[in-house]
């Protein structure tokens, strides 16, 4: 069986259907004896350029191992599903299981925004600081 990396973009009006699509596509892979090594739902993101007057899309990344028959069925499903506006399928040499750069950057931002233990500067503290500097002069 071969390894593939798949990214597909779903029309933003169909974002509610993404979990069902993912379930359908993973069942196609696993029923044929394949494996899903990595599955990341990147959510709704802004497109670099409009596609059919659409400016946002829901992105999904999958790293899979499957047979050619399962891959043919997946490409057929992608082609005839109107909710999928673009898809990209790349053949890989081995399974990729670590976080993608998109997901890693997202988790770094979550960690950074979650660190509320350091004091924040507010407008009141800045006013007090400028007032104390004026008094010193």
UniProtKB/Swiss-Prot annotation:
Q: Which GO terms describe its cellular component?
A: cytosolic small ribosomal subunit
One Pfam entry name: Ribosomal_S6
InterPro entries per record: Ribosomal_bS6, Ribosomal_bS6_CS, Ribosomal_bS6_sf, Ribosomal_S6_plastid/chlpt, Transl_elong_EF1B/ribsomal_bS6
Keyword Acetylation assigned: no
Q: Which GO terms describe its molecular function?
A: small ribosomal subunit rRNA binding; structural constituent of ribosome
Q: Which family does it belong to?
A: Belongs to the bacterial ribosomal protein bS6 family.
Q: What is this protein called?
A: Small ribosomal subunit protein bS6
**What species was this sequence derived from?**
Marinobacter nauticus (strain ATCC 700491 / DSM 11845 / VT8)
> Which gene name does the record give?
rpsF
């Amino acid at each position: 069986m071969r390894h593939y990396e798949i990214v597909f973009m779903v029309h933003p009006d169909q974002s509610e259907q993404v979990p069902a699509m993912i379930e359908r596509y993973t069942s196609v892979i696993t029923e044929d004896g394949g494996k899903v090594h990595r599955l990341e739902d990147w959510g709704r993101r802004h497109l670099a350029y409009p596609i059919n007057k659409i400016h946002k899309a829901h992105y999904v990344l999958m790293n899979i191992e499957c047979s050619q028959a399962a891959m043919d069925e997946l490409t057929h499903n992608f082609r005839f599903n109107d909710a999928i506006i673009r898809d990209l399928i790349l053949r890989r040499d081995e399974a990729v299981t670590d976080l993608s750069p998109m997901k890693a950057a997202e988790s770094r931002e979550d960690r950074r925004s979650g660190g509320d233990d350091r004091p924040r500067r507010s407008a009141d503290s800045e006013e007090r600081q400028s007032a104390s500097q004026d008094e010193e002069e």
